[in-house]
Swiss-Prot record:
It holds the Pfam family tRNA_SAD. GO terms for cellular component: cytosol. Catalyzes the attachment of alanine to tRNA(Ala) in a two-step reaction: alanine is first activated by ATP to form Ala-AMP and then transferred to the acceptor end of tRNA(Ala). Also edits incorrectly charged Ser-tRNA(Ala) and Gly-tRNA(Ala) via its editing domain. It is an enzyme of class 6 (ligase). The gene is alaS. Consists of three domains; the N-terminal catalytic domain, the editing domain and the C-terminal C-Ala domain. The editing domain removes incorrectly charged amino acids, while the C-Ala domain, along with tRNA(Ala), serves as a bridge to cooperatively bring together the editing and aminoacylation centers thus stimulating deacylation of misacylated tRNAs. Keywords: Aminoacyl-tRNA synthetase, ATP-binding, Cytoplasm, Ligase, Metal-binding, Nucleotide-binding, Protein biosynthesis, RNA-binding, tRNA-binding, Zinc. SMART domains: tRNA_SAD. This is Alanine--tRNA ligase. Transmembrane segments: none annotated. It comes from the Bacteria.
Length: 876
């Protein structure tokens, strides 16, 4: 009879306790020693300072069953949960740890004894495979010579795309922190399940499943990527309880283990569902674990950070309950069954059961009030959707009005093969996200933490010079009374002509001057109702209360004004040319360029770009007056003024009009007349996300500089082609036609050379038990020609095994071909994998044809020499 999940957990802890390990309780899901982590996501999190040598324990060996959550940040599994066999928001990580005590030898021996020992897990040894980091020869030898695993079941895994330490077998908790090479143990479910061993093209299948990762902690990765040796080499291992339970209980999905079967039955009972195979049951069974334990560890639903992740998970579960037909609140009713199935690991949850149930019930009730209306709105929007992408505005409205996290909306859409414009959603959420970052301190910079009680009056519409008084000073985010020469600071004035970054327009630059001091302003930002001048005091001293003369960089402001006015003209022109579906999704207005993101489902045609340019320049030539009026928001909208989605407006708004061509709400600075812009020129059009296009353009002197540069390039090309700009098109077409002809002739010559080379090679084949074996390294042959040559040789040699290789710029290209009558004994994929491994690469393919690459050209001769022996053994 197989062990229950609770028994497996206890057996793991008992085994390592018998090996001198201290059994340490699971730490909270909220890390208390690592501000870089949203949630505890690995067993070693609570020991991070021990690995770094910053904390001392009265034991050097430890074992745990650690509660973990992966539903936000780098390790985000949420969208896959319920749809795959092994993704979870919550899981338990079984682990054993050595803090400068034992290292590779003992760690591997312990793992092998627990997995295969008759008194423990008793797994068949022949079902276990292992991987090691490519250069970790010591670990390889322990597995081969001491444990006795055959070489063919020990796989070296190198760096991804040559990036140092970017490997599945070089473990790191995050971008910084403890790390080191690791060895992973895989269980082979058998050939009745599709999939290949790790490192093979079929490795994503379900046949070979990773069950244990043993990390040899040797380094501390710094922010700049350097590796510093840890004080003492240590060991950190992790084995997912749910995965090993699936193996020991002889099931292929984690959701089929006893723990999840019990929870799924409980979910079916409280929702009234009858089909126990419904994926929504799996989603809810997973989500009750993460939600209940997060609440028990002090996380409450909110719109910020950890609380928002919890809210997302709860609401995803409630929505799946709705899909199952649940007519009343159900989610909180699963806490009791969860406590029962968790056994000893649920004791803390049991103590807080009433509170956890109340929190979950309240959140579910709040969401249930808007869920049906939100789903109805979403159904309505999807029904009239023209393309395959839901716009960000609708996604934001679902969030803002009905409490739909965007990934819940994405879940609904994914079931109908529809994407969500998350860029548009993020644009609408930007202000809320900024406030959340400031409040949490996660990644906040010093200036973002500034709080100013006073307000600044902006007078920059009419003045570029103004006298003001210093009302506050900040250095590194902290309020100070004075600053001295050389210090960087934020200066707040009672009134200022400096425009603070807003609505896409960059902040002004300039100077603050006074008695004996000069402060160079590099940027201007808003801090609540205050305007902060960011820069450096270049001379003198400055203190709160000082009088200053504020001088805006006039030439820079003038260029910004032209670009901002041109942005409005372009917005209106885009709506005329492309349609009224065009809506602003983001913008940047600087002194050098204007950038405009807008909703549109396809790339603009050259003719459309020209139309927009022509329309804007026509309005510039009309020299329309640019007028501003202050009016009520409702009146402005009634007048047809366009408001930007995501922007928050006061009841009284500033309406900017350019004749009858453009009317928008805008607080930015602008030209006096459209003619001031001079010239408008689009320099690029591109896509930034699904349904979002981006235009970059220049105006005035910048536009003239672009025209001159293009003219110069055309003249240079004409000179190279020995023509002039008038007949440049004909010259280029002639060159391209000649190039195509030469390329065609060259390819014909290459084909002839390859055919001749194939004919020459066929005579070099050797006979192995009636099968022709041909192995050759070819010089001067393009990699793509190898496949053609293999096809030719297979036709010539009939029953054959072929391996060809070439080296181009130090990179090895390999191909193996096997005639179909031989594939029952020799498979091209296995053969090419054996050769590729020796030259620092990997590859795969079909039984009759496989390709690979490698980086170690020096090892190629020896690798090719090994083919005959390998093939001979297969043909025996």
């Amino acid at each position: 009879m197989s062990k229950s999940t609770a028994e497996i957990r206890q057996a793991f802890l008992d085994f390592f306790h018998s090996k001198g390990h201290q059994v340490v309780a699971s730490s909270s899901l909220v890390p208390n020693n690592d501000p870089t982590l949203l949630f505890t996501n690995a067993g070693m999190n609570q020991f991070k300072d021990v690995f770094l040598g910053l904390d001392k324990r009265n034991y050097s060996r430890a074992t745990t069953s650690q509660r973990c959550v992966r539903a936000g940040g780098k390790h985000n599994d949420l969208e896959n949960v319920g749809y795959t066999a092994r993704h979870h928001t919550f899981f338990e990580m079984l682990g054993n740890f050595s803090f400068g005590d034992y290292f590779k030898h003992d760690a591997i021996q312990f793992a092998w004894e627990l997995l295969t020992g008759e008194n423990w897990f008793a797994l068949p040894k022949e079902r276990l495979w292992v991987t090691v980091y490519e250069t970790d020869d010591e670990t390889y030898e322990i597995w081969e010579k001491e444990v006795g695993i055959p070489r063919e079941r020990i796989i070296r895994i190198g760096d991804n795309k040559g990036a140092p330490y970017a490997s599945d077998n070089f473990w790191q908790m995050g971008d910084t922190g403890p790390c080191g090479p690791c060895t992973e143990i895989f269980y082979d479910h058998g050939d009745h399940i599709w999939g290949g061993p790790p490192g093979s093209p079929e490795e994503d299948g379900d046949r070979y499943i990773e069950i244990w990762n043993i990390v040899f902690m040797q380094f501390n990765r710094q922010a700049d990527g350097t590796m510093e040796p840890l004080p003492k080499p240590s060991v950190d291992t992790g084995m997912g309880l749910e995965r090993i339970a699936a193996v020991l209980q002889h099931v292929n999905s984690n959701y089929d283990i006893d723990l999840f079967r019990t929870l799924i039955e409980a979910v079916a009972k409280v929702t009234g569902a009858t089909d126990l195979g419904n994926k929504s049951l799996r989603v809810i069974a997973d989500h009750i674990r993460s939600c209940a334990f997060l609440v028990a560890d002090g996380v409450l639903p909110s719109n910020e950070n950890r609380g928002y992740v919890l809210r997302r998970i709860i609401r995803r579960a409630v929505r799946h309950g709705n899909m199952l037909g649940a007519k009343e609140t159900f989610f909180y009713k699963l806490v009791g069954p969860l406590i029962e199935v968790m056994g000893s690991a649920g004791e803390e949850l049991k103590r807080q059961q009433a509170q956890v149930e109340q929190v979950l019930k309240t959140e579910e009730e709040q969401f249930a009030r808007t869920l049906e209306r939100g789903l109805a709105l979403l159904d309505e929007e999807l029904a009239k959707l023209q393309g395959d992408t839901l716009d960000g505005e609708t996604a934001f409205r679902l969030y803002d009005t009905y409490g739909f996290p965007v990934d819940l909306t994405a879940d609904v859409c994914r079931e109908r093969n529809i994407k969500v414009d998350e860029v548009g959603f993020e644009a609408a959420m930007e202000e809320q996200r900024r406030r959340a970052r400031e409040a949490s301190g996660f990644g906040a910079d010093y200036n973002a933490m500034i709080r100013v009680d006073s307000a600044s009056e902006f007078k920059g519409y009419d003045h570029l010079e103004l006298n003001g008084k210093v009302t506050a000073l900040f250095v590194d985010g902290k309020a100070v009374e004075a600053i001295n020469a050389g210090q960087e600071a934020v200066v707040v004035l009672d009134q200022t002509p400096f425009y603070a970054e807003s609505g896409g327009q960059v902040g002004d630059k300039g100077e603050l001057k006074g008695a004996g001091f000069t402060f160079a302003v590099d940027d201007t930002q808003k801090y609540g109702q205050a305007i902060g001048h960011i820069g450096k005091l270049s001379a003198g001293a400055l203190k709160v209360g000082d009088a200053v003369q504020a001088d805006v960089d006039e030439a820079r402001r003038a260029r910004i004004r032209l670009n901002h006015s041109a942005t409005h003209l372009m917005h209106a022109a885009l709506r005329q040319v492309l349609g009224t579906h065009v809506a602003q999704k983001g913008s940047l207005v600087s002194d050098k360029v204007l950038r405009f993101d807008f909703s549109h489902n396809e790339a603009m045609k050259p003719s459309e770009i020209r139309q927009v340019e022509d329309l804007v320049n026509a309005q510039i030539r009309r020299n329309l007056p640019i007028e501003t009026n202050i009016m009520d928001l409702d009146a402005a909208k009634a007048k047809g003024a366009m408001a930007l989605f995501g922007e928050k407006y006061d009841e009284r708004v500033r309406v900017l009009s350019m004749g009858d061509f453009s009317t928008e709400l805008c607080g930015g600075t602008h030209a006096s007349r459209t003619g001031d812009i001079g010239l408008f020129r689009i320099i690029s059009e591109s896509g930034t996300a699904a349904g979002i296009r981006r235009i970059e353009a220049v105006t005035g002197e910048g536009a003239m500089a672009t025209v001159h540069a293009q003219s110069d390039r055309l003249n240079d090309i004409a000179h190279l082609l020995k023509g002039d700009s008038q007949n440049l098109g004909d010259k280029v077409r002639a060159v391209l036609e000649r190039t195509r002809q030469l390329e065609k002739e060259l390819q014909q010559l290459k084909d002839q050379a390859a055919a001749q080379e194939s004919a020459n090679l066929s005579s070099k084949a050797v006979d192995l038990n009636g099968v022709k074996l041909l192995v050759s390294e070819l010089a001067g042959i393009e990699p793509k020609m190898l496949r053609t040559m293999v096809d030719d040789l297979k036709n010539q040699l009939v029953s054959t095994v072929i391996v060809l290789a070439t080296v181009v710029e130090g990179k090895v290209s390999l191909i193996a071909g096997v005639s179909k009558d031989v594939t029952d004994r020799v498979k091209a994929g296995e053969l090419i994998g054996m050769v590729a491994q020796q030259v620092g690469g990997k590859g795969g393919g079909r039984p009759d044809m496989a390709q690979a690459g490698g980086t170690d050209a020096a090892a190629l001769p020896a690798a090719l020499a090994s083919v005959q022996g390998w093939v001979s053994a297969k043909l025996q």
